[in-house]
Amino acid sequence: MNDLPSPVDPELAERRRARELRRAQRRRQVFIRRLIALAILGVIAIAIAGGIALSSGGSSPESATKQPSPTTPAKPTEPTKLKPEAILGAINPKVAGITTFRGNLTRTYYGHGPVPRHPAVKWRYPTSGGMCAQSADEHGVSTWCGTGWTGQPNVIPHKNGLLELRFGAYDDNYHFLNGRTGKPIKPELVTGDLAKGSATSDPDGYPLYYAGSRDNNFRVIAMDRASPTTLWSMNSETTVPYGHWNNDWDGAALVVGDYLLEGGENSWFYVVKLNRGYAGGRVTVNPEIVLTVPSWDDQLAADFSTDAFSIENSVSYRKGRVYFANSAGLVQGWDIRDILRGGSNYRRTFRFWTGDDTDASVVIDDKGFLYVASELEKYDERSTQVGQLMKLNPFRKKNPIVWSLPVRQTGSEGSGGLWSTPALDRGMLYVSTNAGGLLGVDRKTGKLRWKIPLPGPTWASPVVVDNVLIEGDCTGVLHAYDVSREGVRPPQLWSLKVDSGCIESTPAVWRNWIWVGTRGGAMFGISERARPKRAARAKNA
């Protein structure tokens, strides 16, 4: 790996200067908005005794607040006594399916084998053309196609044998397909902008789907109607005092009990009481936003001097504590046990700064250690000090780093580091790099055991099922490696040209099937290729 970044060409430098100018303008706007918001809050605090309930922990940022629900749907008209629809979820280990990104609360479940050993593309959706739409970002309006970095599908087995595939795409829609045929089984759910794809199906059997869009709205969707139906939504602009950076919803939510946990690109973490039930034979919800927590604090604003605090990863959870990171590199842990019991107390239990944009989800192992992957764009002192891949002990506040590894080799836009979420497998950790390639790292020591170069950027998060490691590259090729021997550079089992578009999305693996979308515009179903029939033996004359 290179110790220094590659030279930056003048055009790229000019784009960076323009981006920094836009960020500075946004910072000035946000500063003015914050002053106005603080003035309003001050008036309210004087007028209303008690004010807003604050966190019980002294380390909690002062702007963390309990929030009311933005809308109040009607309550169920009858008690919840009906048996939920037979949709199986993987967060619950007693049932089957991949219901959220990386399948469980700690983001460590990758699917169910067997993995195809002689794979072939069985179907493409759509059969021609692509799932494309126009959308605007800081670079202007452009056409987006297919599924991107956050686009792992849900896999939902039904009791009648149907295998359902659910995913969002850059055509602004959520799609619901027969996983074996690629044919739609329900109409699309149309949103007002990109549907990034990291959505969640209810893990407790309720026919509900939780999905965000770049149109500002995070939706709770009923799946027991003829068409997917939005029962409730929360708007990233109107549900918090003020936001930072963006209004998208990149992360896949978690459902813990009757509570939904989600982070937004508006830089806030949410806890929503769902109040799930049934009325008239149909699923109902009566959601209430019970907690919002900012992803930043004053120390981060001083250290990072930017308003880029968005949460672009999927939150993780273990034993009452939720973990997430933001695009300024702040990793936080919050104790929300009392909130999940209907109380009002919560506190920050962990704070760690990586020094740079951290979009990958925090992964938690069985001992409670955290594995964090960070990008390398700023090349500042902090990111040099702590590296881009690290194992953290969240119960050790003064020096939580167990080990760290620099990943400085540069790729797209002159950036190094990691966009993908690491995969844990026995004593190893696997992660793909922005420069292009796979790393195999010893979980205990942090020692780099091997690396495999691939055409980058490789943003898809690796998956490991039945000792097979699967990763996509940016030429549209899917690779499978035999990782049965820990610590040894794995031999490639197969590679499959899926499409010409970059594979940014994480594959979903389930019982001899692999599904993956590409930036070329389509979703693909992959399974064992048909074996040729043996030719009849020639008869002796």
Residue ranges of predicted features:
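Extracytoplasmic/lumenal domain signature
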Residues: 70-96, 101, 108-149, 154-250, ...
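Terminal targeting segments of Actinobacterial cell-envelope proteins
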Residues: 1-32
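Core hydrophobic alpha-helical transmembrane segments of single-pass membrane proteins
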Residues: 38-49
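C-terminal region of N-terminal signal peptides and the immediate post-cleavage residues
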Residues: 47-69
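Low-complexity, Ser/Thr/Pro/Gly-rich disordered linker/stalk regions
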Residues: 31-34, 38, 64
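Intrinsically disordered, low-complexity Ser/Thr/Pro-rich tracts
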Residues: 2-3, 8-12, 61-70, 112-114, ...
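Short, flexible coil/linker elements and helix-boundary hinge sites characteristic
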Residues: 5, 9-10, 56-57, 140, ...
